[in-house]
Regions:
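Short, Gly/Pro- and small/polar-rich lid/capping loops
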Residues: 1-10
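A short glycine-rich, His/Asp/Glu-containing loop-to-beta-strand
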Residues: 13-69, 118
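A short beta-strand-loop-beta hairpin characteristic of the jelly-roll/cupin
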Residues: 65-87, 102
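Short, compositionally biased
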Residues: 104-115
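Conserved, well-structured core segments that form or line functional sites
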Residues: 117, 124-130
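Short, charged beta-turn/beta-strand-edge "cap" motif at the junction between a beta-strand
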Residues: 97-101
Length: 130
């Protein structure tokens, strides 16, 4: 008997200029415990004057967890927080009753080729934290 219940094969998803390997949600599993989305980003290489441009968008009732192996992402949100996420650092954004945020390659990194490699997961919050 195996301890593995379901093997989920990821699929490529375009996020506007770069692709992620998305494992969740999937046909056989929409969630695993509190995990709603699970994306592997890259490794991706961007030419000069290009990069990640995830425009402002809303979230509600969840937390996003971003961890980079390589590259940098500029996180900005509607609560006024700005953070450059670097390799080995974690960005945990709790949406609760609502937040909007963007993720972009920092301006200073766009002058030269850049790389991005990391993971991002969306975690459902308990009802009392929404």
């Amino acid at each position: 008997m195996s301890a593995i219940d379901t093997l989920i094969r990821g699929r490529q998803r375009d996020l506007g200029g770069f692709s992620v390997h998305r494992v969740l949600p999937s046909g056989p599993r929409q969630m695993v415990g509190p995990f709603i989305f699970f994306d592997a980003m890259g490794p991706a290489t961007f030419a000069p004057n290009t990069g990640v441009d995830v425009r402002p968008h809303p979230h509600i009732g969840l937390a996003t967890v971003t961890w980079l192996f390589e590259g940098e992402l500029l996180h900005r949100d509607s609560l006024g927080f700005t953070q450059v996420i670097r390799p080995g650092e974690v960005n945990w954004m709790t949406a609760g009753s609502g937040i909007a945020h963007s993720e972009r390659t920092p301006v200073e990194n766009r002058e030269r080729p850049s790389r991005l490699h990391g993971i991002q997961s969306w975690v459902a919050l308990p009802r009392h934290a929404e």
